[in-house]
């Protein structure tokens, strides 16, 4: 889990817009965050398996 200080730092508006980065809304993870959902790959997978994301299905081919 992300430290509270880092979550707060990412939540504020940076002095320069290139310094802004996305964090997972659930766990605060800074890497591999899907912008469309606002979730990291791990939380996205867990929520999709539980059926909490409407329209998201496991791919099969």
Curated annotation (Swiss-Prot):
Family: Belongs to the universal ribosomal protein uS14 family. Zinc-binding uS14 subfamily.
Annotated InterPro entries: Ribosomal_uS14, Ribosomal_uS14_bact, Ribosomal_uS14_CS, Ribosomal_uS14_sf
Pfam family, one: Ribosomal_S14
Binding-site positions, Zn(2+): 24, 27, 40, 43
A GO cellular component annotation in the UniProt record: small ribosomal subunit
GO MF terms, alphabetically ordered: rRNA binding; structural constituent of ribosome; zinc ion binding
UniProt keyword terms in alphabetical order: Metal-binding, Ribonucleoprotein, Ribosomal protein, RNA-binding, rRNA-binding, Zinc
Annotated SUPFAM superfamilies: Glucocorticoid receptor-like (DNA-binding domain)
Protein known as: Small ribosomal subunit protein uS14
GO BP annotation list: translation
Subunit relationships: Part of the 30S ribosomal subunit. Contacts proteins S3 and S10.
Keyword Cell division on entry: no
The protein's role, per its UniProt record: Binds 16S rRNA, required for the assembly of 30S particles and may also be responsible for determining the conformation of the 16S rRNA at the A site.
Cofactor, free-text remark: Binds 1 zinc ion per subunit.
The protein's required cofactors: Zn(2+)
Lineage: Bacteria, Bacillati, Actinomycetota, Actinomycetes, Bifidobacteriales
């Amino acid at each position: 889990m992300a430290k509270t200080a880092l979550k707060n730092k990412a939540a504020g508006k940076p002095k320069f817009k290139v310094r802004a980065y996305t964090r997972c809304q659930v766990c605060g993870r800074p890497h591999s965050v899907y912008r469309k959902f606002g979730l990291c790959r791990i939380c996205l997978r867990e929520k999709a398996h539980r059926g909490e994301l409407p329209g998201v299905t496991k791919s099969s081919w």
